[in-house]
From Swiss-Prot:
Catalyzes the transfer of a dimethylallyl group onto the adenine at position 37 in tRNAs that read codons beginning with uridine, leading to the formation of N6-(dimethylallyl)adenosine (i(6)A). NCBIfam families: miaA. This is tRNA dimethylallyltransferase. Monomer.
Length: 311
């Protein structure tokens, strides 16, 4: 059975540094579980790790697709499983590091995407239907077959509306029902999982998030978004809806001021961290590491290593 170490937690909690230190001590390689860092050219807004910051540790699933390309949890699972096997077969430890809980769950709950993978013709039909009759009409199709998705999704979120309709067409189940069934496969995985969640005092975390946004602005987030626009990437693309990118686009479009954009990025990032923590708390397999209780990252790393070896 493959040993799999997972380091997760909210944005800006310090997953990168901890995972690199662990990789150095455990002869590991890192697989990113971040839904924004998979996109090429989107470096500043995603807080993407630099080559220098990697400290020679190989990183996987970073800069995987172009910003206009489709990438979802099914794509992540397939690529992550390949990387895990490759790393393990070379005698190294695969370490998953990131904050996208759905990506992590797809591995440790062994989500099965074979039944409801793709129906390109149906997707094309729905997309054309949205053009002809409007997004509201396509959204209304959910009402009788998947009321939960109908209530939760907005008509403008066409990608997810189409996905929910697609899953129902292929499986006859709502997307939430399908996901819950997958989650029942809790232990049906080929991994010996050691799953750690990093956390810290909420006020300190929010301060770190605010500071990170200021650093992003100083590094040239506005210029990065301008460059992406010049390359033909548009606000309707999933990648450009990410926190930081959508707000800067609003600013560049004249809808809000720069100060408002910065405020919204900070607020959106803090709310995202809150949602991440809520998600991670639902998982009973994870061990929580309160960073405030340790004097240094080295202490945290040593504690994690000890718990892994004592398991």
């Amino acid at each position: 059975m493959i040993d799999l170490l997972i380091i997760a937690g909210p944005t800006a909690v310090g997953k990168t540094d901890i995972s690199i230190k662990l990789a150095e001590k455990l002869n590991g390689e890192i697989i990113s579980a971040d839904s924004m860092q998979i996109y090429k050219y989107m470096d500043i807004g995603s807080a993407k790790i630099t080559k220098d910051e990697m400290k020679g540790i190989p990183h996987h699933l970073i800069d995987v697709v172009e910003p206009h390309e489709e990438f979802n949890v099914s794509s992540f699972k397939a690529l992550a499983e390949e990387s895990i096997k490759d790393i393990w077969n070379r005698g190294k430890l695969p370490i998953i590091a990131g904050g996208t809980g759905l990506y992590i769950n797809s591995l440790i709950y062994n989500y099965d995407f074979t039944d409801a993978d793709r129906d390109e013709k149906y997707r094309e039909y729905l997309t054309k239907l949205a053009e002809d009759k409007g997004k509201e009409y396509v959204h209304s199709l959910l009402k009788d077959i998947d009321e939960e998705s109908y209530e939760k999704l907005y008509p403008n979120d066409l990608k997810r509306v189409v996905r929910a309709l697609e899953v129902y067409k292929i499986t006859g189940k709502s997307i939430s029902e399908y996901t819950k069934e997958n989650e029942k496969k809790l232990y049906d995985i080929p991994y010996n999982v050691n799953y750690f969640i990093l956390n810290m005092n909420r006020e300190v975390l929010y301060e770190r998030i605010n500071k990170r946004v200021d650093i992003m602005m100083g590094k040239g987030l506005i210029e990065e978004v301008k460059k992406l626009e010049s390359m033909g990437y548009t606000p309707d693309m999933q990648s450009m809806k990410g926190i930081g990118y959508k707000e800067v686009l609003f600013y560049l479009n004249g809808d809000i001021s720069l100060d408002e954009a910065i405020y919204l990025i900070k607020k959106g990032s803090r709310n995202y961290a809150k949602r991440q923590l809520t998600w991670f708390r639902k998982d009973k397999r994870s061990i929580w590491i309160d960073k405030d209780k340790y004097n240094s990252e080295e202490e945290i790393v040593d504690k994690i290593i000890k718990m892994v070896k004592d398991k």
